[in-house]
């Protein structure tokens, strides 16, 4: 039930009984009136609507609210709200009153404008960062789409890079040139060269291994045991300095003479 209480300043304050009366009674029971009643110089009743929200230890809060909005308007607003909404309403009024006293022209609008400007700036920065990131992602996706993937694609890539499927790996120990090989009686140069190894191209039946050695070696050609052979290297044998061919373990016993 609401009742009107005249204030010393001539304004009328409406006091409504609500569930917050217990909190107001606890404040008033200590003998110290709430900040609103103390400022208005009146006795704080147990059902005072201001007591739960304007404690006596923070009088400046009610002073600012009363100066900007007026005590009667605040009382009317609190009476129209539910008890669980009053605390948020009082805090909003106190903040807005404080900002209005700091900036009489703009008040809270000035702070809101600054925050909105900062928000727009951050949104623009975020959009630019997303645009730059999308460019890098598009470039990475294009590179991944053009790169060969899988064993078959890798084989095609190697086949295109090396026509006719030839895979030659030559390691030369010393910087020198090999003499030309001509016919069945090819003659190497007399100078001492380093060891040279050449891996010929792969055949369907296995992986042939060819070695070319100059320093007291010769020429050997055969198949490794990985191809399912007998284990011993078979082939044409060794080609020394003289132009003779000697059969290997798997070859025949024929020897071409020097006149061939």
Curated annotation (Swiss-Prot):
One of its GO terms (cellular component) is nucleus. It is found in: Nucleus. Keywords: Developmental protein, Nucleus. Expressed in leaves, leaf primordia, immature ears, immature tassels, whole ovules, silk and husk leaves. Found on the adaxial side of organs. Signal peptide: none annotated. InterPro entries: LOB. It holds the Pfam family LOB. Residues 32-133 form the LOB domain. Transmembrane segments: none annotated. Might be partially redundant with the IAL genes. Belongs to the LOB domain-containing protein family. Interacts with RS2. Promotes the switch from proliferation to differentiation in the embryo sac. Negative regulator of cell proliferation in the adaxial side of leaves. Regulates the formation of a symmetric lamina and the establishment of venation. Interacts directly with RS2 (rough sheath 2) to repress some knox homeobox genes. This is LOB domain-containing protein 6.
């Amino acid at each position: 039930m609401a009742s009107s209480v005249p204030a010393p300043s001539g304004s009328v304050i409406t006091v409504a009984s609500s569930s917050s009366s217990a909190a107001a009674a606890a404040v008033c029971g200590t003998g110290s009136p709430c900040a609103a009643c103390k400022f208005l110089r009146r006795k704080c009743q147990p059902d005072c609507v201001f007591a739960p929200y304007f404690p006596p230890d923070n009088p400046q809060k009610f002073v600012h609210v009363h100066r900007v909005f007026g005590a009667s308007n605040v009382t009317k607003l609190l009476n129209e709200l539910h008890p669980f909404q009053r605390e948020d309403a009082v805090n909003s009024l106190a903040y807005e009153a404080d900002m209005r006293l700091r900036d009489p022209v703009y008040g809270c609008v000035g702070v809101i404008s600054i925050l909105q400007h900062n928000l727009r700036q951050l949104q623009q920065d975020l959009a630019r960062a997303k645009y730059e990131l999308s460019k890098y992602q598009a470039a990475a996706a294009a590179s991944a789409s053009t790169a060969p993937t899988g064993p078959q694609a890798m084989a095609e890539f190697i086949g295109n890079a090396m026509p006719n499927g030839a895979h030659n790996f030559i390691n030369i120990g010393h910087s020198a040139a090999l003499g030309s090989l001509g016919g069945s009686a090819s003659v190497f140069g007399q100078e001492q060269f380093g060891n040279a190894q050449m891996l010929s191209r792969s055949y369907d039946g296995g992986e042939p291994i060819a070695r070319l050695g100059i320093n007291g070696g010769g020429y050997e050609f055969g198949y490794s045991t990985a191809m399912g052979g007998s284990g011993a290297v078979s082939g044409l044998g060794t080609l020394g300095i003289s132009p003779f061919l000697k059969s290997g373990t798997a070859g025949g016993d024929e020897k071409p003479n020097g006149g061939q």
